[in-house]
């Protein structure tokens, strides 16, 4: 018996020189309201990114054992707000800055460096007792918009149970992705059968304990087999395959793997960014951001199951006898 499948077998990470600008010159009076060192104490990030940001920090500390930067995991809205208000020099997000945010930073004498780091899939998870294994992207959009609320509205053979939808919180990167990308700039429903449970870990717990639930989390939470408190690995949870077609079938539905993200087979893909405003070219925040786009930093994303933004790769057919 032969089984043929595609795997990513090569990964050459590119170091692109000349893309790490430093910020010089004097800051205006608004920038100097807080001491530099006070602002440099910690990084901020959307909570859904915490597993891979922790890994990046661990890897960076191998180089910089004297690193004095702590983490504050919050929601994406507050993370960007803190960056703009000059309460941190670095934020990890899944969106770029708006023109208004760029202007505010410019008025404060700061030049943001927005660096794409990796690509992540927004994974849909269900309880293992749920009969569903595939879903069309447009059906999930109908669920989170409130158009449908029962499983048998997706497939008449499914039970008539209410679909319980779990996400982290209304200020998160997940919520924004659902509203902006899946619902095309329409508000996601947040009442009734759709509920915020605050964190990605709580989404996983909720789905594991509710057979009729569906949750949405970053795919980076699926892959860490070393920390079962963070991951879906070993839990009573199934990851749905999602189709771009109007009707999901086993042949047109894909999971959020590196391969399917790289080849754009999976419909729900987002970009992870580091946004750095550190005015010092040798500052810790700028050093951390730069590390994330260097080969060692990109390998951290690769090993976390994400697809690195700066990578060359090859795909071959592997035959197993």
Q: Which sequence ranges carry the predicted segments?
A:
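C-terminal motif of bacterial Sec signal peptides marking the signal peptidase cleavage site
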Residues: 18-22
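Periplasmic N-terminal soluble interaction domains immediately after the signal peptide in Gram-negative
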Residues: 112-113
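Core hydrophobic alpha-helical transmembrane segments of single-pass membrane proteins
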Residues: 11-15
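Exported/periplasmic ABC-transporter solute-binding proteins
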Residues: 23-77, 81-84, 118, 126-321
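Bacterial N-terminal signal peptides that target proteins for export
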Residues: 1-10
């Amino acid at each position: 018996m032969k089984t043929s499948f595609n795997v990513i077998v090569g990964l050459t990470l590119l170091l692109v020189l000349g893309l790490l600008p430093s910020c010089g010159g004097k800051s205006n009076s608004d920038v100097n309201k807080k001491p530099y060192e006070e602002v440099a104490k910690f990084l901020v990030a959307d909570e859904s990114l915490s597993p891979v940001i922790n890994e990046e920090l661990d890897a960076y500390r191998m180089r910089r054992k004297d690193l004095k930067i702590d983490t504050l995991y919050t929601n994406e809205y507050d993370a960007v707000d803190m960056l703009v208000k000059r309460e941190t020099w670095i934020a990890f997000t899944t969106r770029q800055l708006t023109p208004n945010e760029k202007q505010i930073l410019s008025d404060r004498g700061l030049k943001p460096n927005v660096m794409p780091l990796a690509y992540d899939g927004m994974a849909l998870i269900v309880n293992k007792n749920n009969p569903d294994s595939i879903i069309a992207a447009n059906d999930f959009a109908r669920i989170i918009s409130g158009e449908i609320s029962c499983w048998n509205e997706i497939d008449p053979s499914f039970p008539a149970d209410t679909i319980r939808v779990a996400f982290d919180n209304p200020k998160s990167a997940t919520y924004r992705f659902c509203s902006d990308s899946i619902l095309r700039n329409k508000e996601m429903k947040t009442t009734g059968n759709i509920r915020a449970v605050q964190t990605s870990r709580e989404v996983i717990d909720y789905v594991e304990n509710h057979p009729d639930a569906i949750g949405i989390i970053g795919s980076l939470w699926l892959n860490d087999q070393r920390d079962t408190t963070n991951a879906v690995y070993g839990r009573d949870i199934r990851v749905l395959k999602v189709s771009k077609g109007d009707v999901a079938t086993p042949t047109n539905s894909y999971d959020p793997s590196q391969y399917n993200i790289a080849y754009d087979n999976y419909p729900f893909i987002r970009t992870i960014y580091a946004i750095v405003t550190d005015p010092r070219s040798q500052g810790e925040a700028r050093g951390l951001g730069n590390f994330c786009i260097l080969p060692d930093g990109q390998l951290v994303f690769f090993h976390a199951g994400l697809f690195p933004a700066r990578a060359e790769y090859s795909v071959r057919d592997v035959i197993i006898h």
